[in-house]
Amino acid sequence: AKKYLAKTKGSNIFIGSVHNRRAFPGASPYAATKGALETLTKVLAAELGSKKIRVNCVVPGGVFTEINQRAGLFDDDAAKKRLEDMASIHALGRIGTPMEIAEAIEYLICAEWTTGAVLEVDGGLGLGLTNA
Protein backbone atom coordinates (compact mmCIF):
# COMPACT_ATOMS: atom_id res chain seq x y z
CA ALA A 1 0.00 0.00 0.00
CA LYS A 2 2.92 2.33 0.69
CA LYS A 3 3.93 2.46 -3.01
CA TYR A 4 0.38 3.27 -4.10
CA LEU A 5 -0.06 5.91 -1.39
CA ALA A 6 3.28 7.50 -2.32
CA LYS A 7 2.28 7.61 -6.00
CA THR A 8 -1.09 9.18 -5.22
CA LYS A 9 0.08 11.27 -2.23
CA GLY A 10 -2.60 9.43 -0.31
CA SER A 11 -3.98 9.44 3.18
CA ASN A 12 -4.25 6.67 5.75
CA ILE A 13 -6.78 7.10 8.56
CA PHE A 14 -6.93 4.84 11.59
CA ILE A 15 -9.95 4.59 13.87
CA GLY A 16 -8.99 4.80 17.53
CA SER A 17 -11.22 4.84 20.60
CA VAL A 18 -11.90 6.88 23.72
CA HIS A 19 -11.02 3.67 25.57
CA ASN A 20 -7.50 5.07 25.40
CA ARG A 21 -8.64 8.08 27.46
CA ARG A 22 -11.17 6.56 29.83
CA ALA A 23 -10.99 3.33 31.77
CA PHE A 24 -13.84 0.95 30.98
CA PRO A 25 -13.42 -2.25 33.04
CA GLY A 26 -13.24 -5.39 30.93
CA ALA A 27 -11.96 -3.59 27.84
CA SER A 28 -8.19 -3.88 28.36
CA PRO A 29 -7.30 -5.75 25.12
CA TYR A 30 -9.49 -3.40 23.07
CA ALA A 31 -8.11 -0.30 24.82
CA ALA A 32 -4.51 -1.44 24.39
CA THR A 33 -4.85 -2.05 20.66
CA LYS A 34 -6.72 1.20 20.06
CA GLY A 35 -4.10 3.07 22.08
CA ALA A 36 -1.38 1.48 19.96
CA LEU A 37 -3.06 2.89 16.85
CA GLU A 38 -2.49 6.43 18.13
CA THR A 39 1.23 5.79 18.54
CA LEU A 40 1.38 4.05 15.17
CA THR A 41 -0.33 7.09 13.62
CA LYS A 42 2.40 9.42 14.85
CA VAL A 43 5.29 7.11 13.95
CA LEU A 44 3.98 6.42 10.45
CA ALA A 45 3.27 10.12 9.89
CA ALA A 46 6.91 10.85 10.72
CA GLU A 47 8.20 8.00 8.56
CA LEU A 48 6.00 8.61 5.52
CA GLY A 49 5.73 12.40 5.47
CA SER A 50 8.69 12.78 3.12
CA LYS A 51 6.77 10.62 0.63
CA LYS A 52 3.76 12.97 0.96
CA ILE A 53 1.70 10.23 2.63
CA ARG A 54 -0.50 11.57 5.42
CA VAL A 55 -1.43 9.42 8.42
CA ASN A 56 -4.09 10.46 10.93
CA CYS A 57 -6.42 8.91 13.49
CA VAL A 58 -10.07 9.59 14.37
CA VAL A 59 -11.09 8.85 17.97
CA PRO A 60 -14.88 8.41 18.21
CA GLY A 61 -16.92 8.49 21.37
CA GLY A 62 -19.99 6.30 21.76
CA VAL A 63 -21.62 5.74 18.38
CA PHE A 64 -24.91 3.98 17.69
CA THR A 65 -24.34 1.78 14.66
CA GLU A 66 -26.36 -0.71 12.65
CA ILE A 67 -24.06 -3.44 13.98
CA ASN A 68 -25.19 -2.61 17.53
CA GLN A 69 -28.80 -2.67 16.42
CA ARG A 70 -28.53 -5.94 14.45
CA ALA A 71 -26.80 -7.58 17.41
CA GLY A 72 -29.78 -6.65 19.57
CA LEU A 73 -27.62 -4.67 21.97
CA PHE A 74 -30.34 -2.10 22.56
CA ASP A 75 -33.49 -4.24 22.38
CA ASP A 76 -34.46 -4.74 26.03
CA ASP A 77 -35.08 -2.31 28.89
CA ALA A 78 -31.64 -2.91 30.42
CA ALA A 79 -30.03 -2.11 27.08
CA LYS A 80 -32.06 1.09 26.73
CA LYS A 81 -30.85 2.11 30.19
CA ARG A 82 -27.24 1.46 29.11
CA LEU A 83 -27.81 3.68 26.08
CA GLU A 84 -29.18 6.48 28.29
CA ASP A 85 -26.24 6.10 30.69
CA MET A 86 -23.79 6.20 27.80
CA ALA A 87 -25.40 9.36 26.43
CA SER A 88 -25.24 11.05 29.84
CA ILE A 89 -21.43 10.83 30.07
CA HIS A 90 -20.99 12.71 26.78
CA ALA A 91 -20.83 16.50 27.27
CA LEU A 92 -23.32 16.91 24.43
CA GLY A 93 -25.78 14.55 26.15
CA ARG A 94 -26.08 11.99 23.36
CA ILE A 95 -24.09 9.40 21.49
CA GLY A 96 -22.88 10.01 17.98
CA THR A 97 -23.90 8.78 14.57
CA PRO A 98 -21.81 7.02 11.94
CA MET A 99 -22.30 10.07 9.68
CA GLU A 100 -20.62 12.33 12.25
CA ILE A 101 -17.57 10.07 12.26
CA ALA A 102 -17.61 9.92 8.45
CA GLU A 103 -17.55 13.73 8.31
CA ALA A 104 -14.39 13.80 10.43
CA ILE A 105 -12.79 11.21 8.16
CA GLU A 106 -13.79 13.27 5.12
CA TYR A 107 -12.09 16.30 6.65
CA LEU A 108 -8.85 14.37 7.21
CA ILE A 109 -8.90 12.98 3.68
CA CYS A 110 -9.14 16.53 2.30
CA ALA A 111 -6.81 18.24 4.80
CA GLU A 112 -3.54 18.15 2.87
CA TRP A 113 -1.60 19.95 5.61
CA THR A 114 -2.62 17.56 8.38
CA THR A 115 -0.61 14.50 9.34
CA GLY A 116 0.05 12.79 12.66
CA ALA A 117 -3.20 14.18 14.06
CA VAL A 118 -5.40 12.36 16.54
CA LEU A 119 -8.84 13.93 16.12
CA GLU A 120 -11.28 13.35 18.96
CA VAL A 121 -14.84 13.20 17.64
CA ASP A 122 -16.46 12.11 20.86
CA GLY A 123 -19.22 14.51 21.86
CA GLY A 124 -17.12 15.42 24.88
CA LEU A 125 -16.81 11.87 26.26
CA GLY A 126 -13.05 12.31 26.67
CA LEU A 127 -13.66 15.19 29.08
CA GLY A 128 -14.30 12.63 31.81
CA LEU A 129 -17.79 13.69 32.86
CA THR A 130 -19.75 11.24 34.99
CA ASN A 131 -23.45 10.53 35.07
CA ALA A 132 -23.67 11.21 38.81
Language-model segments: residues:
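A short helix-coil junction within the Rossmann-fold of NAD(P)-dependent oxidoreductases
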Residues: 1-9, 111
